[in-house]
Amino acid sequence: EYQIISTLPSITSAASYLTDYSFIDTAEKGIPYLQNGVTLEFFKDAACTDKIATWTETDGKFNASYTTNDAGYVMSITMTESGLSEINTSKAVYTDASMVNSGYSDCTLRITYSAQLDKSANYGDKGNTNDVVLTWKRTNSSYYDTLVDDCHVYVFGLDLTKKFSDGKGDLSKVEFCLQNDADDYYVVAKYDESAKAYYVTGSTDDKAKATRFT
């Protein structure tokens, strides 16, 4: 699971309403996005504890599209007219008519999405680049503002060998799953026949849905 976190700019009048608030996220080849799973959450605080609203792709508040280029995979998230209207004019935060700010002014937006690994990912210290560009524009402006951020995704592998102490037994009947004790989730993975390896595709809190490694 991956997150993009941004602080919405101040919105104080119709002249400062946002007419564009969009993200372009680029992940290096080896980390393709899992499509149709983007969630947007708005919070009153920077720590993301006081939630205002949650949007999914089916709500019509934003659009998510996916392409590829020489750099890797590209995901674009753009607010729709309905989404921008809520960001600009919602009364969920600034309820008093005398308040200067409106909508989700100065609130925190957290975008959550998922991606998986494949055999072209870089393992070890080199890492895999993941860049994001935020673009926004106001009603009273003829230009766009942009903000760029980046991170590196580091990947590692586990080489596990099954053995019976007496050298006997049917290894094909020995299965196991992987659990992260700290965050209390199980690993979901997909087997790549050509690479003879499993690649992590997600996680689940339901042990019955965890991948059974053989």
Give, region by region, the residue ranges found by the protein language model:
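Solvent-exposed loop/turn and edge beta-strand elements of beta-rich ligand-binding domains
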Residues: E1-T214
